[in-house]
Amino acid sequence: MNWESEWFRIELIRGSRRISNFFWAFILLSGALGFLSVGLSSYFGKDLISFLSYEQIVFIPQGIVMCFYGIAGSAFSLYLWGTIFWNIGSGYNKFDKGKGIVCIYRWGFPGKNRRIRIEFSMKDIEAIGMEVQEGFYPRRTLRLKIKGQQDVPLTYIGENLTLREIEEEAAELARFLQISIEGF
């Protein structure tokens, strides 16, 4: 969702609260708890969950390995649920012609640097960079080329924009900032 006037433009960036992240976090947690319960069932010698039988699993070495996979999967699932809860990567791009500044704002992990804010002058922007890589895992990103600094990404890496959408977004932004578009 974007908002634009003659002197002001805001682009909202969607973070990690995506349907795919919810799906994978749930699947990973379910599988990890299944592995952990079968591993613990083989240790205790009784079924902790009735439909997951432990009888074919000897605790050493299969039960230990299943417990390890269950703990590792639970930890990774907890990480995914944390990124969803804190909405890591969400934020906005603000372009203000009146003040002549660009502000890139993102939410990070909790701590001292949770709020990530990059601010620079519009005079320092050289061009809009558009990177397009086709193939099995296509990558399409927009970047701001800034004098004397590294490029600043404007789009989320996991965002699956079509070539037409990324071109339209680049053209709108270039028209608003009155600068050129370059390819990488």
UniProtKB/Swiss-Prot annotation:
<feature type="transmembrane region" description="Helical">
    <location>
        <begin position="21"/>
        <end position="43"/>
    </location>
</feature>
<dbReference type="GO" id="GO:0009535">
    <property type="term" value="C:chloroplast thylakoid membrane"/>
</dbReference>
<keyword id="KW-0934">Plastid</keyword>
<comment type="function">
    <text>Seems to be required for the assembly of the photosystem I complex.</text>
</comment>
<keyword id="KW-0472">Membrane</keyword>
<protein>
    <recommendedName>
        <fullName>Photosystem I assembly protein Ycf4</fullName>
    </recommendedName>
</protein>
<keyword id="KW-0602">Photosynthesis</keyword>
<keyword id="KW-1133">Transmembrane helix</keyword>
<keyword id="KW-0812">Transmembrane</keyword>
<comment type="similarity">
    <text>Belongs to the Ycf4 family.</text>
</comment>
<keyword id="KW-0793">Thylakoid</keyword>
<dbReference type="GO" id="GO:0015979">
    <property type="term" value="P:photosynthesis"/>
</dbReference>
<keyword id="KW-0150">Chloroplast</keyword>
<dbReference type="Pfam" id="PF02392">
    <property type="entry name" value="Ycf4"/>
</dbReference>
<dbReference type="GO" id="GO:0009522">
    <property type="term" value="C:photosystem I"/>
</dbReference>
<dbReference type="InterPro" id="IPR003359">
    <property type="entry name" value="PSI_Ycf4_assembly"/>
</dbReference>
<feature type="transmembrane region" description="Helical">
    <location>
        <begin position="58"/>
        <end position="80"/>
    </location>
</feature>
